[in-house]
């Protein structure tokens, strides 16, 4: 799993991660 020491680190990482996948994998998050 992920070892994230600070909440904001996860938030920023996920934000970038989501932005990269948004166009191609948007459906996975929307269901």
Curated annotation (Swiss-Prot):
The protein's matches in SUPFAM superfamilies, at most eight in alphabetical order, are given as: Hemerythrin-like (SSF47188)
Q: InterPro entries, alphabetically?
A: Haemerythrin, Hemerythrin-like_sf
Asked if the keyword Cytoplasm belongs to this entry, the reply reads no
Alphabetically list the UniProt keywords: Iron, Metal-binding, Muscle protein, Oxygen transport, Transport
Give the source's domain of life in one word: Eukaryota
Which residues take part in binding Fe cation?
25
Please give the Gene Ontology molecular function terms for this protein. iron ion binding; oxygen carrier activity
Q: In which tissues is it expressed?
A: Muscle.
Q: How does it assemble?
A: Monomer.
**What family name appears in the similarity comment?**
Belongs to the hemerythrin family.
Per its database record, what is this protein's job?
Myohemerythrin is an oxygen-binding protein found in the retractor muscles of certain worms. The oxygen-binding site contains two iron atoms.
Name-wise, this protein is Myohemerythrin-2
